[in-house]
From Swiss-Prot:
Residues 344-363 form a propeptide. Residues 35-128, 142-224 form the UPAR/Ly6 domain. Residues 249-278 have a biased composition (Low complexity). This is Ly6/PLAUR domain-containing protein 3. Glycans are attached at N120, N131, N178, N185. InterPro entries: LY6_UPA_recep-like, Snake_toxin-like_sf. Residues 304-318 have a biased composition (Gly residues). Residues 238-287, 301-336 are annotated as: Disordered. Supports cell migration. May be involved in tumor progression. It is found in: Cell membrane.
Length: 363
């Protein structure tokens, strides 16, 4: 019985819960912020009959409208965006100047439904373009893109205008760039061409909150056909010149290297020549000394033999004098052996000396 009652009460509880949550969900959907939404590219894209109403997503508390206007000496145009924004309510106005190109930017955010239609997107706070017929051309010619689409502002398709000086400014340069506006998660961009003051600016620009005006300048008739991928140098700065590689410095370097190599190699060559010479001298000196000893020994022995075999008196005295001198002053080969024996002793001694010399020569 209790189980049956529980089974009956469970669907009732689910139904009651959904009935309580449904008003809350409907109330939250009804409280979603509503904003106007449109995009204007130098046209009437944000005119009243072309604007739409959108409901913003969760967490979006403000509606946004932003407009950026650009003025050249030949005209002006504007880009604008309306939609659901982000941030806090408020207003921001800013005026910009890029080498004689004037720009005006306005941003407004509000937190009420359909509150983002307060800015005038057609009448801007810019100085009206001057009467071209009242000014005398200064000789410069440029392509002009004022509110033209990107398809109509390519290469030499835009109209050509004559530059003139206005408001005390000299306009003799040509400009090629873009204006970009980002607001309400939408980005709008249009090309900008015309006459400017600077003739040599390179990728210069001015910015505001979500707004950018940037481009490059050049000098010469109709030089602003396409400056996106080109770089122009100021005439006051000398251009970069690539010098050819040196051709005369290399041989002199080789000559210096060869001379230094020769000078360092000379001592090594001399040393290698001197060392064998020293070794040869030390190697051959024993043989020369042996020959000198043999010659001196032979001369001494011949003198002694003459003393014994000669007449009495002078021959014997000469023989004794030679032997005494040999004992006092030994020869170069070492101590001399006095000859005391006869011819047999002399022969055996000479044989021993000859055998020693032959053995040394063979070794």
């Amino acid at each position: 019985m209790d189980a049956a009652r529980r089974g009956d009460t469970q669907p009732v509880m689910w139904t009651t819960g959904w009935l309580l949550l449904l008003p809350l969900l409907l109330c939250e959907g009804a409280q979603a912020l509503e904003c106007y939404s449109c995009v204007q590219k130098a046209d009437d894209g944000c005119s009243p009959h072309r604007m739409k109403t959108v409901k913003c997503g969760p967490g979006v508390d403000v509606c946004t409208e932003a407009v950026g206007a650009v003025e050249t000496i030949h005209g002006q145009f504007s880009v604008a965006v309306r939609g659901c924004g982000s941030g806090i309510p408020g207003k921001n106005d800013r005026g910009l100047d890029l080498h004689g190109l004037l720009a005006f930017f306005q941003l407004q955010q509000c937190s009420e439904d359909r509150c983002n239609a307060k800015l005038n997107l057609t009448l801007r706070g810019l100085n009206p373009a001057g009467n071209e017929s009242a000014y005398e051309p200064n000789g410069a010619e440029c392509y002009s893109c004022v509110g033209l689409s990107r398809e109509k502002c390519q290469g030499s398709m835009p109209p050509v205008v004559n530059c003139y000086n206005a408001s005390g400014r000299v306009y003799k340069g040509c400009f090629d760039g873009n204006v970009t506006l980002t607001a309400a998660n939408v980005t709008v961009s249009l090309p900008v061409r015309g006459c400017v003051q600077d003739e040599t600016c390179t990728r210069d620009g001015v910015t505001g909150p979500g707004f950018t005006l940037s481009g490059s300048c050049c000098q010469g008739p109709r030089c602003n056909a396409d400056l996106r991928n080109k770089t122009y140098f100021s005439p006051r700065i000398p251009p970069l010149v690539l010098l050819p590689p040196p051709t005369t410095a290399a041989p002199s370097t080789r000559a210096q290297n060869s001379s230094s190599t020769t000078s360092t190699a000379a001592p090594t060559t001399t040393t290698s020549i001197i060392k064998p010479t020293t070794a040869q001298a030390s190697h051959t000196s024993p043989h020369e000394m042996d020959l000198e000893v043999i010659q001196e020994e032979g001369a001494s022995l011949s003198g002694g033999a003459a003393g014994h075999g000669g007449t009495a008196g002078h021959g014997g005295a000469a023989g004794h004098q030679d032997r005494s001198n040999m004992e006092k002053y030994p020869g170069k080969g070492g101590a001399q052996i006095p000859a005391k024996g006869g011819s047999g002793t002399l022969g055996s001694w000479l044989s021993a000396v000859l055998l020693t010399v032959v053995a040394g020569a063979m070794l």
